[in-house]
Amino acid sequence: MGMTVADIRRRKQAERLSRLHQQASLVLAKQPGGSLWLFGSWARGDWDGFSDVDVLAVAPNRSQASELADAVLDQEMADDVLALTDQEWQERRNGDDPYWRAIGRYALQLGLS
């Protein structure tokens, strides 16, 4: 029996996540102290052919977070990158805003340095 659409989607998501983990390792090797998180449709698993890749670049301070976000863009591993400090990430993912709570619920850590 052939592959189902669900099988193909799982395979494509696994391939994309594998590439993102590899790219995250390269970026984080040069940016110590940070972490990268996938969020949005690719993290939730409801992506389609038009979905972009959304990444959070999290670091101890604003300067490091911005440098990490720039490195993600330079590596071309994401379409949209948000830079947050560790404190901002913890406050937002655990706060009252339903948008950020949803991001925190489904975000997948791509790497930690």
Residue spans of the language-model regions?
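Catalytic core of pol beta-like nucleotidyltransferases
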Residues: 1-37, 44-50, 58-113
